[in-house]
Amino acid sequence: MANNTRARRQARLSRSLGIALTPKAAKYMERRPYGPGEHGRARKKQDSDYAVRLREKQRLRAQYGIREAQMTRAFEEARRTKGLTGENLIELLEMRLDALVLRAGFARTIAQARQLVVHRHILVDGIRVDRPSFRVGEGQLVHVHSRSETMVPLQVAAAGAHRDVLPAVPAYLDVKLEALQARLVRRPKRSEIPVTCEEQLVVEFYAR
């Protein structure tokens, strides 16, 4: 029951933001390609600049499944980092442990990836890490604990069952899926990161 409720909530949020946050939400949006609610089919009036920027920020937050406080901290770090703030922001978010667990194909959704981390199934360089926000460094190995490899969901992942719903493995990850191992070979580049976002709108939202 809880899973069904969560799935419906994600589908509703996906329709509201105009982006599929889970494979189930993608199928739901194919059937109902309009916003939620009784007025979802109606033509909407043009959004204000603030509303456009807010929605883009919410879209980015939802794709990484993070809280507003986490987003704000990441933005402040991105702003202090040399380079374009918007690109820096997404690159920093992509180096979160839960994001890389998802990209590697160990999980089907960002929520599942976070659960794997929180429940201590994931190691970084041989050390258990239970913080989804952990920043993985270049060259570090993300892998599943040997005692967890026999779990059915992880056996399913190792067999490549999620590849039909996930983007191709990006070039910044070296993945050995059958071994449930993934190495971050270098810092991700914004152009390679499979998230849908006009990051300049996010920058403008926080800079207002």
Swiss-Prot record:
SUPFAM superfamilies: Alpha-L RNA-binding motif
Residues in coiled coil: none
Lineage top rank: taxon: Bacteria
Key words, A-Z: Ribonucleoprotein, Ribosomal protein, RNA-binding, rRNA-binding
A GO cellular component entry from the record: small ribosomal subunit
Residue ranges annotated for the S4 RNA-binding domain, each copy included: 95-161
GO biological process: ribosomal small subunit biogenesis; translation
Purpose of the protein: One of the primary rRNA binding proteins, it binds directly to 16S rRNA where it nucleates assembly of the body of the 30S subunit.
NCBIfam families documented for this protein: PRK05327.1, rpsD_bact
Family: Belongs to the universal ribosomal protein uS4 family.
Record note on quaternary structure: Part of the 30S ribosomal subunit. Contacts protein S5. The interaction surface between S4 and S5 is involved in control of translational fidelity.
Record's protein name: Small ribosomal subunit protein uS4
Species: Pseudarthrobacter chlorophenolicus (strain ATCC 700700 / DSM 12829 / CIP 107037 / JCM 12360 / KCTC 9906 / NCIMB 13794 / A6)
